[in-house]
Amino acid sequence: MNVFGLVVNLNKKEVDEVAGQIIRWLEINGCRVLMEEETARSLGLARLGVPQRQLVEQAQCMLVLGGDGTLLRTARRVAFSGTPVIGINLGHLGFLTEIDIPDTFPSLRKLLDGQYYIEERMMLEARVIRQGAAVEKLLGLNDAVITKGAFARISYFEMYVNDEYVNTYSADGIIIASPTGSTAYSLSAGGPVVTPELDLMLITPICPHTLWARPMVIAPDSVVRVDVLKGGGEIMLTMDGQHGFSLRRNDQVVVRRAEKRARFIRLKSRDFFTVLRKKLEGNRDNAKGTE
């Protein structure tokens, strides 16, 4: 592995200095570094810039400098090529990023020496069907979320699993999540935590107006269909909280397991529950700080 695609979140503090150090280290160690043209120009490194398609085709590994959000975006972009991704964390505690800043160069040395393994994660595909025709197709790693806008009235959704009627929900929305997404929006809405090596789908209603509406765990090969019955205002489909599509009354959203899988480079055995505990404790401490 000696051709790296470097993806940089330019909004992170001191990212230009960190990126420069990483690029110099990789080049000194005989590696080639590629970046998106716009990012390369922003960092004063236009010589490294290539078109997006060339970046994905030529890079043997995508090295992401940012947080989990940047890693999610990159994982979706490269899923079709099967390019593995590894993240250097510049954000808060991350579930997906692998390397912390103090460990950057020892970790890169392990990577060059082949001391790593590939962890695959299930992804989701969502299609919007409007008047019998597919009008949008989206790919996600965490979740597909159907939700009303901030000022919209209660919405009504009819849900089917494998063409079998499940229920009609009066709710703020519905989350269909992967195991990776179980610790994201679904968790905040009362869904269960699922370890990421499993293949399954989670369905979590958002603020349902009935006490009996509860989260569900279903088989990974299930096909979930949500019919938008009515709603007073804007209703959106969002994937991973980053890519959205506006829905209309009578639209159908069909969610299934994607054919492609996200591929993450791991340098060490990950203790999922330690990371989970730290995240939950961090949220608790933040809540105390607002009292």
Swiss-Prot record:
Disulfide pairings: none
The protein's required cofactors: a divalent metal cation
Protein keywords: ATP-binding, Cytoplasm, Kinase, NAD, NADP, Nucleotide-binding, Transferase
Gene Ontology BP, a term: NAD metabolic process
Active site: D68
Keyword Membrane: no
SUPFAM superfamilies the record matches: NAD kinase/diacylglycerol kinase-like (SSF111331)
GO cellular component: cytoplasm
Function summary: Involved in the regulation of the intracellular balance of NAD and NADP, and is a key enzyme in the biosynthesis of NADP. Catalyzes specifically the phosphorylation on 2'-hydroxyl of the adenosine moiety of NAD to yield NADP.
UniProt-recorded name of the protein: NAD kinase
Lineage: Bacteria, Bacillati, Bacillota, Clostridia, Eubacteriales
